[in-house]
Amino acid sequence: MALGEDDILSVPFKYFVFCIGGLPSSALLICVLLSLFLHFDQATSTHCEVANWLPSISAAVSTYTPEKYIWRILIGLHIGPRLVVAVAFRNFLMSSPLRPYTGSKQFKFLCNIACGLNLLENFFLLALTSISSSEDHSLHAKCFGGFAISSIIYMILSTWLFSESGRRRATNLGERSYEYKILGASIFVVCFFLGGYLYWRHNTYCEPGIYTLFALVEYSAVLSNIFFHCTLYYDFHGKNIALTSSFGSSHYNLLPTQIEKDT
């Protein structure tokens, strides 16, 4: 990859997307499979001892080793790029040449709100990863609530801002990204409420297989969240993230190559 005159490092944006999508989805798959193979009885047990064949995400990623270490490492690694991407997407929306001039202050304000919600989502996810339900159930539950609420509001708001900015209509990729954002957000919202219902039903009636359905809905919610954020692949298609000098080369004076001796 060719670098500009003042570029020190240039990374294609698609690699950031692979990172924010590949690391958490791989972590989920690995942890669930390891839980099934190594700790099936413990990971799938329920408080009322009914039949269950899949571990919840909490049981799969935060209770047993090596699952909890794999989850924490991979989620921790992907948080950094997600923070960068959160700010980059804010700037992407605000710099659109097609955004409306009327209400520009309100538009910028909402872009900042969306960016803040995205950052909050990541911090709540990091807290969820660091503090398991077995260590502090109350704090873990609060972090989950914060993650879910900030995720839902961010998905809805950022999708609307993407359309309002004009980026949706700029290219065919923009339209595809918009459609995928709606799909990912819709699945996440449906899974959130369906998961809540199944969890309530399991705790109320203790029916066989209901907790398995709850686990499947949990997996779907996580994957739809990842899918939503991976739509950035289309938004930043062909772009790079570069580390560059804030001064042009013209600001540097070359040292002399020879030193003349006084005679």
Swiss-Prot record:
The keyword Endoplasmic reticulum applies. Involved in the lipid remodeling steps of GPI-anchor maturation. Required for stable expression of GPI-anchored proteins at the cell surface. GO terms for biological process: GPI anchor biosynthetic process. One of its GO terms (cellular component) is Golgi membrane. The chain crosses the membrane at residues 16-36, 69-89, 109-129, 143-163, 180-200, 208-228. The keyword Cell cycle does not apply. This is Post-GPI attachment to proteins factor 2. Keywords: Endoplasmic reticulum, Golgi apparatus, GPI-anchor biosynthesis, Membrane, Transmembrane, Transmembrane helix. It comes from Caenorhabditis briggsae. Belongs to the PGAP2 family. Pfam families: Frag1. InterPro entries: Frag1/DRAM/Sfk1 (IPR019402), PGAP2 (IPR039545). It is a multi-pass membrane protein. It is found in: Golgi apparatus membrane; Endoplasmic reticulum membrane.
